[in-house]
Curated annotation (Swiss-Prot):
UniProtKB keywords: Secreted, Signal
Taxonomic path: Eukaryota, Fungi, Dikarya, Ascomycota, Taphrinomycotina
One term under GO cellular component: external side of fungal-type cell wall
Stretch forming the signal peptide: 1-23
UniProt-recorded name of the protein: Uncharacterized protein C306.11
Subcellular compartments: Secreted
Species whose genome carries this gene: Schizosaccharomyces pombe (strain 972 / ATCC 24843) (Fission yeast)
Length: 283
């Protein structure tokens, strides 16, 4: 009897050990069923706590988008080329040149990159630095937006892993205002412009000048800040208006790249320290 009990205990111990070793072996294989649930749990915990902004970068692609065509969702935007972004303003497609939006001359390292999709739409944004991404993206919001899968390779500026991280902040082009703003002009000539300047009536708006016409852009939406967290200042290239943070903690830093505080949950609006050159010109 004693021998049988010892054998049973040994057998149970052996089976448990084999199961444990097998689970460890399976866990060493990415995607193994035994560890899939744990991988998902760990990934979700990691992304919830320390989301990698660089992973939000998807691609730049070419689209057949024409100026003035109807677009379905006001506020969406797409990259048309490496340095041109299309925005949907009042259901009409507007093409903007990223060097103009950023207040930098062409060839100084400005580019349009696409981020991960939001509500089924791929978001585009202008950034400082070059872009080397290629893939297809959701362009269903824009009419005549046929994707041509080409590889984009731009050498108009330097890039690094840090600049990719800083450019991963997606924007949603929505006006964050306390009350609706009504813009009135005596004639169409009052909307004419030859450079991008801050709005004189509303300090948080920048009148982006495109093709001789003003397009008011809300700096709070541009920099992804709560209302009052951003303002416009005419301190860009040749005195052009650009969006800057009003919070003193967002003063320019000496380093050329974004510095992220990894000691707490990353929130682009709170814990990250932004560099003026890399981030403050996103609109």
């Amino acid at each position: 009897m004693f021998a049988f009990a010892s054998f049973a205990i040994s057998a149970i111990f052996f089976l448990c050990s084999f199961s444990y070793v097998s689970s460890i072996k399976l866990c060493g294989i990415p995607g193994a069923p035994a560890c899939k649930r744990r991988e998902i749990s760990l990934y979700k915990r990691a992304t919830d706590t320390f989301p990698d902004l660089s992973s939000a970068i998807a691609s730049t692609s070419y689209y057949n988008i024409s100026e003035g065509t109807y677009c379905h969702v006001s506020g969406s935007n797409l990259c048309v080329s490496p340095d041109v972004i299309a925005i949907c303003a009042n259901h009409s497609t507007v093409l903007l040149n990223c060097p103009t939006v950023l207040g930098y001359p062409k060839g100084r390292g400005s580019a349009c990159v696409e981020t991960n999709s939001s509500y089924g739409l791929t978001r585009g944004l202008c950034q400082i630095g070059s872009s080397n991404y290629s893939t297809s993206a959701n362009s269903s919001n824009f009419d005549n937006a046929n994707v041509i899968n080409v590889t984009t390779s731009v050498s108009s500026g330097s890039t690094s892993t840090h600049s990719k991280r800083s450019s991963g902040i997606s924007l949603s082009y929505t006006n964050i205002v306390d009350q609706p703003i009504l813009f009135t002009r005596d004639s169409s000539m009052d909307w004419s412009c030859n450079m991008t300047l801050c709005n004189t009536d509303y300090p948080y708006l920048v009148n982006t000048c495109f093709n001789g016409t003003q397009y008011p852009v809300n700096c709070n939406s541009a920099l992804r800040t709560p209302f009052g967290g951003a303002t416009c200042r005419n301190i860009g290239y040749k005195g052009q208006g650009i969006c800057v943070y009003t919070n003193d903690s967002r003063i320019p830093v000496a380093d050329d790249h974004v510095i992220v505080n990894t000691t707490s949950k990353i929130n682009p609006n709170i814990t990250s320290v932004f560099n003026y050159r890399d981030n403050a010109f996103l609109w």
